[in-house]
């Protein structure tokens, strides 16, 4: 959503970002600010990051299943949740009000909460991303 950057940069949140949004803590990053990578390497990082996010969302739903909770999940909902987990981390999603609403069966409310999830006026690209994720999540209402 935010685009591609061949050069590593700091976002101001203690993370270094590079490629299609791959983020690492500054203190543990293998990349230095200004260091460049190829699109091929960026694509590999994206695949790895998306797999990690998707696996985390799947584990979350598996845990709910194991607890006996029946939760509706469409492909569009899953895709939106993976996008959020990619951007904010699986733990950030797991502990969110979005997930609490889903567990209660309040899917429309969960979808609306996506719009406000970890956004600020500082990052307008993130607000646009959350709008798209919310719309995708709520597509089951159409």
PLM region spans:
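Long, amphipathic alpha-helical surface segments
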Residues: 1-4, 37, 43-54, 90-142
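Extracellular/periplasmic catalytic domains that process cell-envelope and extracellular macromolecules
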Residues: 9-12, 73-77
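Catalytic nucleotidyl-transfer cores of nucleotide-processing enzymes
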Residues: 1-13
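Substrate-binding/active-site groove segments that recognize
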Residues: 10-34
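Alpha-helical segment that forms one wall of the substrate-binding/catalytic cleft
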Residues: 31-68, 75, 79-93
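Residue-level detector of buried hydrophobic side-chain packing
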Residues: 18, 81-82, 110, 133
């Amino acid at each position: 959503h935010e685009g591609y950057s061949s050069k590593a940069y700091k976002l101001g949140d203690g993370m270094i970002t590079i490629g299609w949004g791959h983020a690492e803590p500054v203190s543990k990053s293998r990349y230095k600010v200004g260091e460049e990578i190829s699109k091929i390497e960026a694509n590999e990082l994206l695949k790895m990051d998306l797999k990690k996010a998707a696996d985390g969302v799947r584990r979350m739903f598996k845990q709910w299943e194991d607890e006996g909770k029946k939760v509706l999940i469409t492909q569009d909902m899953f895709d939106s949740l993976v996008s959020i987990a990619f951007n904010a981390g699986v733990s950030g999603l797991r502990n969110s009000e979005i997930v609490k609403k889903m567990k209660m069966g309040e899917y429309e409310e969960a979808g609306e909460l996506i719009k406000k999830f970890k956004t600020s006026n500082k990052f307008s690209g993130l607000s646009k991303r959350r709008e798209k994720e919310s719309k995708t999540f709520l597509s089951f209402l159409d």
